[in-house]
C-alpha cells in the first residue's frame, strides 16, 4: 500500500462525508485490519488506531477531545499506563477500579458515561470533557491488556453503535498485537 498504487497510508483517514456512522466505523475497522496486517508491535498498531479513531469521529462531527489507549503495565498488573493517543496531554497512570478507565479494566466491560460530572470517582485529565466511552481490550486468556478511551466535549457523545464497533476494534487489537 504505497504511493506506487496511488493509495497512501494517510488515505486510511479520508472518510467520505456521505457515509453514516456505521459505515465510517466499519471503514475504521477495515483500515485497522489493513494497517496492522503483518505488524504485531502494539505501539505501532495502537498509534495508527488512535489516528483512525480520531479522524473517524472528527469526520462524524463528534466533538471528541481525546482518543487513545491505556495499556496494562507489565510490572504492575493492576495499573494502566498511558499509551498512544491523539489530543491533549493526559494522566500517565490509572489504577484498576479507579475512574472510567480503571473500572472498564477491572470489570472487563465497556463503560459509556453520558455525563462524566455524574460519574463517581471520575478522573478528569481534561476538565472540558463531558462524556466518555472506555472499551477494555481483553486477551484470549481473559486478562485486561488495556483500554480504548475516547472523550467528548458534548454530553451523551456515545451510544450502542460506538460500543458495538469499538468492541470489534478491541478484538482486532487483541488478535493483531503482541503486548510485552
UniProtKB/Swiss-Prot annotation:
Pfam family, one: GAF
GO biological process: cellular response to oxidative stress
Keyword Cytoplasm included in the entry's annotation: yes
Enzyme type, top EC level: oxidoreductase
Record keywords, A-Z: Cytoplasm, Nucleus, Oxidoreductase, Stress response
InterPro entries assigned: FRMsr_CS (IPR000614), GAF (IPR003018), GAF-like_dom_sf (IPR029016), Phosphatase_reg/MetRdx (IPR051330)
Compartments where found: Cytoplasm; Nucleus
Catalysed reactions listed for this entry: [thioredoxin]-disulfide + L-methionine + H2O = L-methionine (R)-S-oxide + [thioredoxin]-dithiol
Effect of substituting residue 101 to S: Dramatic reduction in enzyme activity
Ranges for domain GAF: 99-177
Gene3D superfamilies in alphabetical order: 3.30.450.40
Protein family per UniProt: Belongs to the free Met sulfoxide reductase family.
Protein name: Free methionine-R-sulfoxide reductase
Organism: Saccharomyces cerevisiae (strain ATCC 204508 / S288c) (Baker's yeast)
Lineage of the species this protein comes from: Eukaryota, Fungi, Dikarya, Ascomycota, Saccharomycotina
Amino acid at each position: 500500500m504505497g504511493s506506487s498504487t496511488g493509495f497512501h497510508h494517510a488515505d486510511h483517514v479520508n472518510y467520505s462525508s456521505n457515509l453514516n456512522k456505521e459505515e465510517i466505523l466499519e471503514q475504521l475497522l477495515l483500515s485497522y485490519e489493513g494497517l496492522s496486517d503483518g505488524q504485531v508491535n502494539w505501539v505501532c498498531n495502537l498509534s495508527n488506531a488512535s489516528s483512525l479513531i480520531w479522524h473517524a469521529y472528527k469526520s462524524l462531527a463528534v466533538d471528541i477531545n481525546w482518543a487513545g489507549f491505556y495499556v496494562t503495565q507489565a510490572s504492575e498488573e493492576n495499573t494502566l499506563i498511558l499509551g498512544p493517543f491523539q489530543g491533549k496531554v493526559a494522566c500517565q497512570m490509572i489504577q484498576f477500579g479507579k475512574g472510567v478507565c480503571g473500572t472498564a479494566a477491572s470489570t472487563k466491560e465497556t463503560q459509556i458515561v453520558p455525563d462524566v460530572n455524574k460519574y463517581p470517582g471520575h478522573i478528569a485529565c481534561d476538565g472540558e470533557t463531558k462524556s466518555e466511552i472506555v472499551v477494555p481490550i481483553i486477551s484470549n486468556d481473559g486478562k485486561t491488556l488495556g483500554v480504548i478511551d475516547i472523550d467528548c466535549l458534548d454530553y451523551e457523545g456515545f451510544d450502542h453503535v460506538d460500543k458495538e464497533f469499538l468492541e470489534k476494534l478491541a478484538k482486532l487489537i487483541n488478535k493483531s498485537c503482541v503486548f510485552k
